[in-house]
Regions:
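Aromatic/acidic polysaccharide-binding cleft in carbohydrate-active enzymes
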Residues: 44-122, 135-140
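Loop/turn elements at helix/coil->beta-strand transitions in domains of secreted/extracellular proteins
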Residues: 14-17, 40-44, 74-79, 130, ...
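Short, glycine-/Ser/Thr-/acidic-enriched flexible segments
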Residues: 21, 26, 52-53, 86, ...
Length: 201
């Protein structure tokens, strides 16, 4: 409501280049942006602050897939993390929250490890090019999350996150993609989460 009111003010609108969103609620609340996008389709949206939790299990790759996919599908042209590099305890502390690092440096061994958010970003960033469009992808079902991009050169990038649950006790999930009249099947790992990136030309 606040953003709609501000953009309705002509003087304010003339000074605004875009809207920075912080999605602190559930991933599904990203749909709140759609009403603003419908009223102001020329205003860019950016997701500018959301980072890992110091307890890795609090925000898994599956958790991040819901957050990142929904924010982008609802209009954000970028998704920014928060702390680039912290130790395993989330220090140096930047506030009262239990923030983790995008990358984590072990304070004893100096070994570098990577957060679940980093792992998900690695399935998007290297493949989705500047100027890509987000396309509607049909076929969502329980246990999978999808997002589909088309790069400026015509290449399509499909990112699939799976929670690892089995369709039946002995049957793994699979993704069947129809592209240019041909069907391609991708079996997904069973019993564990996974993120897969498929490229189509």
């Amino acid at each position: 409501k606040r953003i709609k009111d501000q953009l309705a003010d002509e003087a304010m609108r003339s000074a605004v280049d875009g809207v920075a969103w912080h999605c602190y609620g559930p991933a599904e609340e990203a749909t709140n942006m759609l009403e603003v996008a419908a009223l102001h389709p020329d205003v860019p949206f950016y997701h500018t602050e959301n980072g890992p939790h110091v307890v890795i299990s609090e925000r898994t790759e599956w958790w991040w897939a819901a957050k990142v996919f929904n924010m982008i599908q609802c209009g954000c042209s970028l998704f920014t993390s928060w702390n680039l590099c912290l130790d395993e305890l989330g220090t140096p502390m930047t506030g009262a929250h239990l923030c983790g690092g995008f990358a984590i440096v072990d304070s004893a061994t100096q070994e570098v490890s990577y957060s679940p958010q980093y792992n998900l970003f690695r399935h998007i960033g290297p493949f989705v090019k500047r100027g890509a469009r987000v396309l509607e992808a049909e076929g969502f079902r329980d246990g999978t999350r999808l997002i589909l991009f088309r790069n400026p050169d015509g290449e399509h990038v499909l990112v699939v996150a799976c929670d690892g649950s089995l369709v039946r006790k002995i049957q793994r999930r699979r993704i069947v993609v129809k592209y240019k009249g041909l069907y391609k099947t991708l079996p997904l790992p069973g019993g564990q989460w996974s993120v897969s990136t498929l490229l189509f030309r």
